[in-house]
Amino acid sequence: MKKQLYRIVTGILAVAWMCLIFSFSNQPATESSKVSGGLCHRLVERANDTLHLDMTEKQQLAMAEKIEYPVRKAAHMTEYAILGLLSFAFYRGLLKKEKRQFLAALLTAAVYAATDEFHQYFIPGRSAEVMDVCIDTLGASIGLAILFFTLKVVRKHCQKSKLTLQ
């Protein structure tokens, strides 16, 4: 019963995260740009105030524009890192071998990234880019790699302490 509840909860979390990604992708380009542009401008404003950079409003806008692309891509990578982790949690309750859990999670994120890009093709002002699928999949890979090495370190520590972690 516990395993079944775990599968249901982790499955719901992964699907809910996919829905969130879908909702972001469903925004027309103008709306999406307005959101990310506003965020970048607030980040630059905050940095200017905190670090006492004395940038003019024009310089702040130019800097916000300059960082918008990397900020957007970092956000995509983060979205897909989280999707990779949630998918791993789901497959953890479904598959026995850990290697298969990692591979299934990565494959799920990669396939979802591809379908998400296909979906964006039909949104006004948006396009489908193979490079974005690669960036999203890289995000999932990084999230899963961090998890893999964290588990490795924790297990090593637990062995030294004679604890078990499964």
Residue ranges and their predicted role:
Residues 4-8, 96-104, 126-130:
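Membrane-helix interface segments
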Residues 69-85, 130-138:
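Membrane-interface loop-to-helix entry segments
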Residues 80-93, 138-154:
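Membrane-interfacial alpha-helical segments at the cytosolic side of multi-pass membrane proteins
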Residues 87-109:
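Post-HEXXH active-site segment of zinc metalloproteases
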Residues 113-137:
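Interfacial helix-loop-helix junctions of multi-pass membrane proteins
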